Amino acid sequence: MLDIGVIGRLKFATAFMAMSLLLVPAAEAQEQPVWHYGLSLVDDLKYPPGFKKFDYVNPEAPKGGDLRLSQTGTFDTFNPLLVKGETAVGLDFVFDTLMKPSEDEISTAYGLLAEGVSFPDDISSATFRLRQEAKWADGKPVTPEDVVFSFDKAKELNPLYQSYYRHVVKAEKTGDRDVTFHFDDKNNHELPHILGQIRIVPKHWWEGTGPDGKPRDISRTTLEPVMGSGPYRIASFAPGGTIRYERRPDYWGVALNVNVGQNNFDSITYSFFGDRDVEFEAFRSGNTDYWRENQAMRWATAFDFPAVKDGRVKREEIPNPFRATAVMQAMVPNMRRKPFDDERVRQALNYALDFEELNRTIFYNQYQRVNSFFFATELASSGLPEGKELKNLNEVKDLVPPEVFTTPYSNPVGGTPQKARENLRKAIELLNKAGFELNGNRMVNTETGKPFSFEIMLSSPSFERVALPYAQNLKRIGIEARVRTVDPSQYTNRKRAFDYDVTWEVWGQSLSPGNEQADYWGSAAATRQGSRNYAGISDPGVDALIERVIFAKDRETLVAATKALDRVLLAHNYVIPLYYKLAAQIAYWDALARPKELPKYGLGFPEVWWSKSAACHLPAGVRCSCICGSSGEAGRHQFTPDRRLIRNAQLLDQICAASEFKG
């Protein structure tokens, strides 16, 4: 499954699909299509037909209040389908998809725009039936024509979608509310699933004219607020600075079981920052409400400000590994450029990274070294291959490195001066074999005499704390590594064009990998600009194993094929694995509230959270930092949007007395 924000987190397959007959009696099942209200890859559906809500939501969550969030970077388009430009964060609030995931089941989703999906036994096609009540924000119905238009334009305009949906060859209207997708291969178990992820856009709106009287063009970027069928609309924005989404009171799907207890904030505003440190200051100052931390030093040292001490800011570390898993974070050499096409060079670069020293000196020993492209999941390879994994590898034996059968992958271990010296000596040995030698204090090519130097391209100064010590280690073996942080637009454009020597990347994985693996590691993606094959991997063995992942017929087969793929990717030393923490580190002002139990496979943010000011029915402009009715002065603090505490006890008593909410 493709784990990127703009697409979602769904996955389907038939081998384990637990399904319900929606429209046909059992006697007619042989002749009529079987319509399924939900699909699951891993197990039976948790929720029965006609279920009322997801277990992890609060059906009584109050509606109201404002949520203020932050984002690093910028934006210059609201077009949800293009790869061009910097697409605005938050568009998932505007556009519905055919299916909606359940966050307490693995790779499971239920109908949103679609009331059901059907497909033949050989999975040569899939048909989605739209809900009759599904409407656009202008009141017009969502139609099969909209779905076909959305799919066709997504594949036409975005290389990522071209790869992801490459086995879907045609979409067509096949009924008043039905749209059928045709596949070029049979028994691809994930295709019905990933089709549920497409953002559906209104054909009539995009083929109409804009406020300037000119025809709209979906192939171009635009800052005209786009129309969708989702629970929010774009209410206002400042280009590159802020976006405010406003909840639609006329949203067609508000009462659907997959939406109960969700979409609770009246508005969601994103403020954009060019620097993560400045972004944190906005949170600390009370100008944004929620923070997810990704820097060990800040988590360990920066949360000592007054609002944390007096309880107005809550700080939580949520250890459930399924909320932070299957991640490969790495420095990525670009194999399209020499000498990074030499595996010995890439392996030498890994020996120069002293993770243990970094973990001790700047990470407060909070992190683990990543040692798998499917880190900390059942999909990760370990030890020597056996069983079905070994069978997969034997069947492509001539295409994979022989060491996958004899030597488990392991990262170099440092942490002491002696180990660091040993690792650097090993790096020099590998570089010598690759045609380099030390000439004085410089590593040079033995044939050309050219010094080995390269640029490490970063997107944020916060990564320099790792890259600069790494560059110093490389300098000890004569390599000049220049660390350069570029602005977000330049970073995005250079990544899309593969214009870098070494960069920093995080690949998120689902627990049900599939078509997206070809975009990450497949040969065709290596030359397709806009793909996520940042390393430039082009290897027939990897391609063969990707196909086995995609066409796995059941969970056991999928796990075995993925382990084999992981093992081969590691054996080629394509990347320099970095680190990760198997916990979610979050902080939030206590104007926010959430269900006591978060979903098993996510944080449910912001969908299932709500505003205490809505719960307390406070006057406009007043934000609630307590549960009304709690005892003690500290429990009765209220504050205004600029975080000035209201300490007038009489006023607080009046507010809480008028409130219908008693905590």
Curated annotation (Swiss-Prot):
<comment type="similarity">
    <text>Belongs to the bacterial solute-binding protein 5 family.</text>
</comment>
<dbReference type="GO" id="GO:0042884">
    <property type="term" value="P:microcin transport"/>
</dbReference>
<dbReference type="InterPro" id="IPR039424">
    <property type="entry name" value="SBP_5"/>
</dbReference>
<dbReference type="Pfam" id="PF00496">
    <property type="entry name" value="SBP_bac_5"/>
</dbReference>
<dbReference type="InterPro" id="IPR000914">
    <property type="entry name" value="SBP_5_dom"/>
</dbReference>
<feature type="signal peptide">
    <location>
        <begin position="1"/>
        <end position="29"/>
    </location>
</feature>
<comment type="function">
    <text>Possible binding-protein with either a transport or enzymatic activity.</text>
</comment>
<keyword id="KW-0574">Periplasm</keyword>
<dbReference type="InterPro" id="IPR030678">
    <property type="entry name" value="Peptide/Ni-bd"/>
</dbReference>
<keyword id="KW-0813">Transport</keyword>
<protein>
    <recommendedName>
        <fullName>Uncharacterized protein y4wM</fullName>
    </recommendedName>
</protein>
<dbReference type="GO" id="GO:0015833">
    <property type="term" value="P:peptide transport"/>
</dbReference>
<dbReference type="GO" id="GO:1904680">
    <property type="term" value="F:peptide transmembrane transporter activity"/>
</dbReference>
<keyword id="KW-0614">Plasmid</keyword>
<dbReference type="GO" id="GO:0043190">
    <property type="term" value="C:ATP-binding cassette (ABC) transporter complex"/>
</dbReference>
<keyword id="KW-0732">Signal</keyword>
<dbReference type="GO" id="GO:0030288">
    <property type="term" value="C:outer membrane-bounded periplasmic space"/>
</dbReference>
